[in-house]
Every structure is written in structure tokens, then in C-alpha cells.
Curated annotation (Swiss-Prot):
The gene is codY. DNA-binding global transcriptional regulator which is involved in the adaptive response to starvation and acts by directly or indirectly controlling the expression of numerous genes in response to nutrient availability. During rapid exponential growth, CodY is highly active and represses genes whose products allow adaptation to nutrient depletion. GO terms for molecular function: DNA binding; DNA-binding transcription factor activity; GTP binding. It is found in: Cytoplasm. PANTHER family: GLOBAL TRANSCRIPTIONAL REGULATOR CODY, GTP-SENSING TRANSCRIPTIONAL PLEIOTROPIC REPRESSOR CODY. GO terms for cellular component: cytoplasm. Transmembrane segments: none annotated. This is Global transcriptional regulator CodY. One of its GO terms (biological process) is negative regulation of DNA-templated transcription. It comes from Lactococcus lactis subsp. lactis (strain IL1403) (Streptococcus lactis).
Length: 262
């Protein structure tokens, strides 16, 4: 059996390994899986909205209803509101308490089940909650030492995620601004008309129809789309006689156009 020191080293190694993949829908799955393995429990990481950032379920304690929460990547609002009101680690919550993550329909199946919740902080802000549970066997003091270390590691990782998201938002905003600024008045008018034809962020348009509708030439539309595509703001694909398929890659385009008067 691994010693406390060995387990501690495994957790601190997570910081060095950079196990997050921000392109994944659950960017902290790998990290959560490693933490659950070291602490020997089921575990999940949620942000302050209750959205799942990662989870690992080596032990089957869920029913279909609770499985759906993990499938939807979102825990119930009532549970999340209670969880974010915890400011220090709450250990070994009995299975019949509101903060226990076990399905209430299955309490009889896990009479010795316990849940431990630990707040995650980073840069002085509450970033989420680390939730762990076992069907049998309380979390010991050694386990809780690992939990405290784990939340520190997660806090650093989440802080990095927020920083990267901020940098990405700034980059997208800058690219959208630069792309719109390259457009002439007629081209901006054309792009606005095209956006109105889309179903949300994508759809297909017929340039000649839009050109006739707003009184411009088809070449103006073609030039506008070429500029936006070269800036990485949209992508397009010819559909032949059906027109052109468009997808907005940078949704900042909507705000930039909305701020212009035509």
C-alpha cells in the first residue's frame, strides 16, 4: 500500500504533467481520474455553476437518474447552491444528508456511504468544489490531507483555465474587430444581411438573392466573405446551386456588427 508521502508526490506530479486538455468538453477528466485513484474514491470537479469539469467513477453508486446528471455534465441547482455555501472541507457526510451525492432512491443500498466536499479556491476566488464519495469506509485524516492538497492543485489548474479563457476571449475580440474594420460600408451592410439569414451561428445563403434584396452587387458579398474567412472569423463551403454554407467561428462578429449603424 502506498504511503502518504508517495500519494502526496503523485498529486503534486499532476501540476508538473499538465494533464488538462482545454479542447475537451471535460478538460479535467484526466486529472480527476488520477486524484480519484490516489484517494481511492469516486470524484468529480464542478465549477460554481455546477457544471462538470471532470469526473471519475471507479465504483458504481449511481442510478439512471444520477447517471443523467453526469451525462448532461451538470449537477442539480439545489445541490450546487448548497455546495457553494461550504467554505471549508466537509468530510464524511452521511448518506442520508442533503449534501450526500448518493441517489436518495438508493440509500438502502449504501448505508455506510460517505461524501466529502472541499471548496476550490484560486487567486482569492471560489472557483468550484471537489466532491468525493465512497460506498464504504470513511475518509481518514491522511485522506483529508490529500484532499486539501488536491484542491490546491485543482485551484492552480482552474486559475490557469480562467486565464487562458480570458486570453482567448481577448484574442477573439481583437480578431473580430480587425476583421470588421477591413470591411467597407457596403461590405458591412452585406455581412449584416447575411448574418440575419443564418440559423444562429450557421446556415446557407444565396449571394445573388441577398444582393438583390439590399441593392448591392454579388461581388461585394463575395469580397466581404473572403475577408472574414481569411481572418478566421467564418468558414464557408460552396453548395453549388443551393448557395453557400456559412458558419460563424468567432461569435464576437455579432457584437461588432450590432454596434455599427447602417
Amino acid at each position: 500500500m502506498a504511503t502518504l508521502l508517495e500519494k502526496t508526490r503523485k498529486i503534486t506530479a499532476i501540476l508538473q504533467d499538465g494533464v488538462t486538455d482545454l479542447q475537451q468538453e471535460l478538460p479535467y477528466n484526466s486529472m480527476t481520474e488520477r486524484l480519484a485513484n490516489v484517494i481511492d474514491c469516486n470524484a468529480c470537479v464542478i465549477n460554481t455553476k455546477g457544471e462538470l469539469l471532470g469526473y471519475s467513477l471507479p465504483y458504481n453508486t449511481n442510478n439512471d437518474r444520477v447517471d443523467q446528471f453526469f451525462y448532461d455534465r451538470k449537477l442539480p441547482d439545489e445541490y450546487v447552491r448548497a455546495a457553494v455555501r461550504i467554505y471549508d472541507t466537509m468530510a464524511n457526510v452521511p448518506v442520508d444528508r442533503p449534501l450526500a451525492i448518493f441517489p436518495e432512491e438508493s440509500l438502502g443500498d449504501f448505508p455506510k456511504g460517505v461524501t466529502t466536499l472541499a471548496p476550490i479556491y484560486g487567486s482569492g476566488m471560489r472557483l468550484g468544489t471537489f466532491i468525493m464519495w465512497r460506498e464504504d469506509g470513511e475518509f481518514t485524516d491522511d485522506d483529508l490531507v490529500l484532499v486539501e492538497l488536491a484542491t490546491t492543485v485543482i485551484g492552480v489548474q482552474l486559475s490557469n483555465l480562467k486565464l487562458e479563457q480570458m486570453e482567448e476571449n481577448i484574442r477573439k475580440d481583437t480578431m473580430a474587430t480587425m476583421a470588421v474594420n477591413t470591411l467597407s460600408y457596403s461590405e458591412m451592410k452585406a455581412v449584416k444581411a447575411i448574418i440575419e439569414e443564418l440559423d444562429g451561428e450557421e446556415g446557407h445563403v444565396i449571394a445573388s438573392v441577398i444582393a438583390d434584396k439590399i441593392g448591392i452587387t454579388r461581388s461585394v458579398i463575395v469580397n466581404a466573405l473572403r475577408k472574414l474567412e481569411s481572418a478566421g472569423v467564418i468558414e464557408s463551403r460552396s453548395l453549388g446551386m443551393k448557395g453557400t454554407y456559412l458558419k460563424v467561428l468567432n461569435t464576437g462578429l455579432f457584437d461588432k456588427l450590432a454596434g455599427r449603424n447602417f
